[in-house]
Amino acid sequence: MSMGIRLDEKFQDRRKDGIEDAFMRQAVSSAQNRLRDGRLNAAGELGDWEAFRDHSEEIRQHVLEHLDYYLYQLSENVSKRGGSVFFAETPEEANRYIREVIRSKQAKHVVKSKSMVTEEIGLNEALQEEGCTVVESDLGEWILQLDEDPPSHIVAPALHKDRNAVHETFTAHGYTGSNDPTELGRYARQELRKDFLKAEVGITGCNFAIAESGAVGLVTNEGNGRMVTSLPDTVISVMGMERVVPSYEEFEVLVNMLCRSAVGQRLTSYITTFAGTRAVGEVDGPEEFHLVIVDNKRSNILGTQFQSVLQCIRCAACINVCPVYRHIGGHAYGSIYPGPIGAVLAPLLDGYENYKELPYASSLCGACTEACPVKIPLHELLIEHRRVIVEEKKQSPFVERIAMKGFAVTASSPFLFEAAEHVAPFATSPFATSGQIEKGLPAWTDSKDLPQPNKQTVRDWFKKRGNA
């Protein structure tokens, strides 16, 4: 199962679409500036931000090194709270289990809170095939669902839209008001409330699951997570297998880092933890709770040179500083995980066949690594991906392989190298104008200057200087 957005289009075409979308680029640029500045201000309030990053990295590394222990502890405590736990190796297994739960309830209306992993496994499409109406309750995700538009950002999925675009979408679905944000928000609240009240099943993601208690933690700004977990009689939470913490102590640290890194807030409006089924005497909460823990090739990443990518807490700080994302937007990546984290993660989860271009969609400036609150060496992992693509997978472009082999032969022979230096000015003349190569290599010359080789070589120049 592919988790791509538009894999029927080549990356070069998606990239071009993004670059040529002036409105999207302006929206992304403004959002990046706002989110980046907010993160820096919020981080400064903590004092020694680097110490917090070090501690957060230690927490995530410790969990990954002892993941089997904490997942077992989590599953035991969920069961003690009356919940059911299902370990899904593949997206198909996860979707099949969730469909069976919904089928057993004869449910037709499902409401969801924001969840990257459910998008990763294609859950909405699987449930719609079952005949269910699935409603996203996160405002940004709901807007995109109405517009049949994929998300472009991990934290702010509708980042590429402004209020006029939202107004146009709402109007197409019966809205008659203005484009005032308050009025738009009121309409969304009224419509979503109807879905909350008639939903038979609620589905959530999981920011962090707490092993010592069996609780699931949700971080939201809209309160939709609490509605999804308190109103339906059946609640299903879906989590990537790495999204577990030992205790509330570590949960507190990572939530603090998540909120400040994602949106520049000390805390989001709602930090929700819930565990198991409704207890005797409680008036809300589910009568039935299921926790689906998804592998989807994560276990293949453990113990490899890419293991540190599983430290990710999905804050999107790397995306908010990435110059490539700034120019091409999220849709160009063809994955629900865009930006630097997507360029590292997508090939691991869905194969180099689909995403071998993404590791090259980077300037390797290292801004992503500096911004990451859990210190994932993202730019180093991108370089490692490139090495794997070229040396192990042998998937570099054919022309590039031939060119590199030819250069290796030429550069290792003084005679051939000197001959090439003298031939190059004449060989490139048909493609050059005023000393600049302008044809034949569009991937380079469309965005960079490429001077024509000089007729006087360095060796010739040196000989003349030496005789002077």
UniProtKB/Swiss-Prot annotation:
Molecular function per GO: 4 iron, 4 sulfur cluster binding; metal ion binding
InterPro entries: 4Fe4S_Fe-S-bd (IPR017896), 4Fe4S_Fe_S_CS (IPR017900), FTHF_cligase-like_sf (IPR024185), Helical_ferredxn (IPR009051), LUD_dom (IPR003741), LutB (IPR022825), LutB/LldF (IPR004452), LutB_C (IPR024569)
Record's keyword annotation contains Nucleotide-binding: no
Signal peptide start-end: none
Domain of life: Bacteria
GO biological process: lactate metabolic process
DNA damage in keyword set: no
Amino-acid positions noted as binding [4Fe-4S] cluster 1 in the UniProt annotation, renumbered to this chain: 312, 315, 318, 372
Region (Disordered): 442-468
Binding-site residues for [4Fe-4S] cluster 2, renumbered to this chain: 322, 365, 368
Domain 4Fe-4S ferredoxin-type residue range list: 303-333, 352-381
PROSITE patterns: 4FE4S_FER_1
Composition skew (Basic and acidic residues), residue ranges: 457-468
A family per Pfam: LUD_dom
Classification via NCBIfam families: LutB/LldF family L-lactate oxidation iron-sulfur protein
Function: Is involved in L-lactate degradation and allows cells to grow with lactate as the sole carbon source. Has probably a role as an electron transporter during oxidation of L-lactate.
Family: Belongs to the LutB/YkgF family.
Protein name: Lactate utilization protein B
Originating species: Exiguobacterium sp. (strain ATCC BAA-1283 / AT1b)
GN (gene name): lutB
